[in-house]
Amino acid sequence: NVKILEKIYDFTKEKIDFKFHTCIKSVEVKDSNSFVVKTDSGEEYSCGNLVLATGRSGSKWIGSVCDKLGIAQKSNRVDIGVRVELAAEIFKHITDDVYESKIVYKTDKYNDMVRTFCMNPYGEVVAENTNGIVTVNGHSYSQESLRTENTNFALLVSNKFTEPFKDSNEYGESIAR
């Protein structure tokens, strides 16, 4: 919700320096209590606390920063699935009461948990391009004039990896390719 994000930003903007759309060249430990961040445009920033928010598309880069700084990493789960679109009327009895409903099914054979995610009543399926890999996502609109006659949601199965194969992002990308 944009209003919530605006409130978070307004609350923190006097306490935190935000740098958006900034390409970082390196992150170094200055001493035990501070960092130096260098950008590709030659700027340098020093700080005691550092939050790097790269998102999934920057996971390889942030992994290399962690390796360089000796920060332990943990393999995350990866969600593999499809986006389902159907007539909104089919789920209306659910989405009119619970906008973002979660439906979970446990398979008999492997005990996998299959779940819905990101339900979009009266929404649309859209293409997304992340690092040259095209995937799909869904949107819905509060403005009635933009609504469609369809509802869409992701149907996902989660996988968690351990040694020796632990790169869940690479696995997800290989499936998407």
PLM feature segments, named:
Residues 1-177:
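Residues forming the flavin
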